[in-house]
């Protein structure tokens, strides 16, 4: 199943509609002098749910960034979803980032696992293992295993994933969404070469995280 990708993410349509109706009603009843703050809220909701198309690098061994945000970890770690040692790269998304998730590589999904959990600040390391999360494990045609984990944050309370085990994914394909601040962890084979560093701002699909 392909993730729907209009300019404004479908997940945001109900929130945008509610914010627009409230702003219009208050504007009609009380005037712009009071309603302006609700118009600002509408603008914020629209920008939060934006979901623009992105250029996709064609480099064969590139692992693309699955989300917009800032790099908060580049380290060797255990991948509990594929049971291996791996290179872990983590992306933290604040409320101003685009919140759709996109596949980092071409491949077939071998596993999708959802885990209920806490709602700690997604920027801290223990969010990777304690927060609500959803992991997909992707097997590439070359035999590499890539794990992408959606992690809920302090404000985010709903992870959406639109793919299932056995389905194919193409690099840059939208496969999920997390509402209101979150994190994505990517686990790669040991020996992969990172192309990003901690603190760096990254963009979904257009930024290369690493080379396999």
From Swiss-Prot:
It is an enzyme of class 4 (lyase). InterPro entries: PS_Dcarbxylase, PSD-A. It holds the Pfam family PS_Dcarbxylase. One of its GO terms (biological process) is phosphatidylethanolamine biosynthetic process. Its cofactor is pyruvate. It catalyses: a 1,2-diacyl-sn-glycero-3-phospho-L-serine + H(+) = a 1,2-diacyl-sn-glycero-3-phosphoethanolamine + CO2. GO terms for cellular component: plasma membrane. It is found in: Cell membrane. GO terms for molecular function: phosphatidylserine decarboxylase activity. Binds 1 pyruvoyl group covalently per subunit. The keyword Heme does not apply. Pathway: Phospholipid metabolism; phosphatidylethanolamine biosynthesis; phosphatidylethanolamine from CDP-diacylglycerol: step 2/2. The record marks 181-182 as: Cleavage (non-hydrolytic). Keywords: Cell membrane, Decarboxylase, Lipid biosynthesis, Lipid metabolism, Lyase, Membrane, Phospholipid biosynthesis, Phospholipid metabolism, Pyruvate, Zymogen. Its main location: membrane. The active site is at residue 182. The modification Pyruvic acid (Ser) is found at residue 182. Its EC number is 4.1.1.65. It comes from the Bacteria. It is a peripheral membrane protein. PANTHER family: ARCHAETIDYLSERINE DECARBOXYLASE PROENZYME-RELATED. Heterodimer of a large membrane-associated beta subunit and a small pyruvoyl-containing alpha subunit. Catalyzes the formation of phosphatidylethanolamine (PtdEtn) from phosphatidylserine (PtdSer). Belongs to the phosphatidylserine decarboxylase family. PSD-A subfamily. This is Phosphatidylserine decarboxylase proenzyme. The lineage of its organism: Bacteria, Pseudomonadati, Pseudomonadota, Betaproteobacteria, Burkholderiales.
């Amino acid at each position: 199943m392909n993730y729907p990708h209009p300019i404004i993410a479908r997940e945001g349509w109900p929130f945008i509609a509610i914010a627009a109706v409230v702003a219009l009603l208050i504007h009609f009843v009380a005037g712009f002098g009071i309603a302006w703050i609700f118009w600002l809220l509408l603008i914020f909701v629209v920008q939060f749910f934006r979901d623009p198309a992105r250029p996709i690098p064609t480099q064969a061994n590139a692992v693309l960034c699955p989300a917009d945000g800032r790099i908060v970890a580049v380290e060797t770690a255990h991948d509990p979803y594929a049971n291996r040692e791996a290179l872990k790269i983590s992306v933290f998304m604040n409320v101003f980032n685009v919140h759709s998730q996109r596949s980092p590589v071409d491949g077939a999904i071998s596993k999708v696992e959802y885990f209920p959990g806490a709602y700690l600040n997604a920027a801290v390391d223990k969010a990777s293992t304690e927060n609500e999360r959803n992991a997909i494990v992707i097997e590439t045609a070359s035999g590499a295993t890539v794990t992408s984990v959606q992690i809920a944050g302090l404000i985010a309370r709903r992870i959406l994933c639109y793919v299932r085990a056995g389905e194919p994914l193409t690099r840059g394909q939208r496969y999920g969404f997390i509402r209101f601040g979150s994190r994505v962890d990517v686990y790669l084979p040991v020996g992969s070469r990172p192309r990003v560093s901690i603190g760096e701002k990254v963009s979904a699909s257009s930024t290369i995280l690493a080379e396999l």
